């Protein structure tokens, strides 16, 4: 299971989403590759934070 854990750096905070705005949509860059994806993050987050992603293939849908 440890091989699936990936670290990613928050590059840009895109905006708030969710029914009450409790989720933040962010663009992250993986530390071990040059790949960028969008993720939804619950809780406080800002640019430069390092996230530990247990599942790295799932990408969030864009905000409307």
UniProtKB/Swiss-Prot annotation:
The residues the entry assigns to the signal sequence are: none
Could you confirm whether the keyword Transferase appears in this record?
no
| Keywords (A to Z) from UniProt | Ribonucleoprotein, Ribosomal protein
The yes or no answer to whether the keyword Ribonucleoprotein is present is: yes
Q: Give the GO biological process terms.
A: translation
Q: Which InterPro entries match?
A: NA-bd_OB-fold, Ribosomal_eS28, Ribosomal_eS28_CS
According to its record, what are the GO cellular component terms? cytosol; cytosolic ribosome; cytosolic small ribosomal subunit; plant-type cell wall; plasma membrane
Which Gene Ontology molecular function entries are recorded, alphabetically? mRNA binding; structural constituent of ribosome
Check the record and name the PANTHER family matching this protein.
40S RIBOSOMAL PROTEIN S28 (PTHR10769), SMALL RIBOSOMAL SUBUNIT PROTEIN ES28Z_ES28Y (PTHR10769:SF6)
Instruction: Tell me which family the UniProt entry assigns to this protein.
Output: Belongs to the eukaryotic ribosomal protein eS28 family.
Q: What is this protein called?
A: Small ribosomal subunit protein eS28z/eS28y
The root-end lineage is:
Eukaryota, Viridiplantae, Streptophyta, Embryophyta, Tracheophyta
């Amino acid at each position: 299971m440890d091989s699936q854990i990936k670290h990613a750096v928050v590059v840009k905070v895109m905006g708030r989403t969710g029914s009450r705005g409790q989720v933040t949509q962010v663009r992250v860059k993986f530390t071990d590759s040059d790949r960028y994806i969008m993720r939804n993050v619950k809780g406080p987050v800002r640019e430069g934070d390092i996230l530990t992603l247990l599942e790295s293939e799932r990408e969030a849908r864009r905000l409307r």
